[in-house]
């Protein structure tokens, strides 16, 4: 999924493709300040772009930008890193794009006016070192940007129905975070 549309005068995307959600945000802003807004959300089966996400949140009123980049690491999440990882697969529920947009809108609803958010998550097969998620928040001040970006990533990981299967160099594989 891509967002090939042009931006309007507010910098929000026009003509967003399916799975991309733009323009969601919080309620009324204070005088002279626009409410927080989600400017890009997407699930993609193709490599992610840092530049796309950073460009999406670029605004004259943004003085601080926080960026989170999640990459595929070469070991599992166990404390001892017992398994060497060769890659992983991300699978998404059919509602995942909608839930991603809802989560981002909720986070924007709690962010200071003028804050902008963007998040793109990868699906499909990824090799070690590839980008799995790129999230960013821009705000007038760095503290709000850091806090909003952290909350966005935490909420995406907790609530968006995306599942990860790790593949190990020994040929085995396992689902991560699945409970029976």
Please place each PLM-identified region on the residue numbering.
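Short glycine-rich or small-residue beta-strand-to-loop segments that form or flank ligand, phosphate
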Residues: 132-139
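N-terminal, polar/charged subdomain of small-to-medium soluble alpha/beta proteins
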Residues: 2-15, 19-132, 146-150, 154-180
